């Protein structure tokens, strides 16, 4: 229940609007605090932090399905960038997810990293600077380039199985979304391959569908 949690109330600049709401909620028995300076001050604080956040990193690389994300989620002191962005950083990366905007991503990134010791190694998955529609902070992206790198490998069979588990169409709507993405691949794969992929998808031959995409380095 909300009354047992500490709530933070804010407005643009931390003025009377949030102050009035804070007082009202407090009088109703809620544990509540007002964000000093409001959202604008918070955003400045977040951006100032991200501008200089360059921790030592261990960066995991490897093809889709080798288990990078599984390993990241099992390691203490790791940052799951794809989870923060709610995007898997591929053309099908938004399937089953709700991608976040830049401000939300930066806020979550700040919450995840601001309490970490600056000299402590952090595990992270190798990404381009853009994950879906959001950009990794420039300083952190620079730290990723300079970090220690580990290459993970797995058999084709294992990778296809893992990709299938993560991207498997769970309903007609998801199937439609995946099919709607295929025309964007015509330039890189050619019309014939895209038509083949569309047929495999419609026939529920998902392993064959993923195998072709994997061989073409699309997923």
Predicted regions and their residues:
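Glycine-rich phosphate-binding P-loop
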Residues: 17, 56-76
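Activity-critical C-terminal alpha-helical subdomain
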Residues: 156-187, 191, 195, 199
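A short glycine-rich beta-strand->turn/loop micro-motif centered on a GG-aromatic cluster
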Residues: 28-43, 83
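Helix-loop module immediately N-terminal to the HCX5R catalytic loop
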Residues: 1-6, 44-47, 174, 181
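Conserved nucleotide-sensing/catalytic segment adjacent to the nucleotide-binding pocket
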Residues: 76-143
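Catalytic cysteine-centered active loop of the rhodanese-like fold, especially the PTP/DSP P-loop
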Residues: 2-35
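Conserved small/polar residues in nucleotide/adenosyl-binding loops
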Residues: 216-218
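Conserved phosphate-donor/acceptor-positioning beta-strand/loop module used by diverse small-molecule
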Residues: 125, 143-165
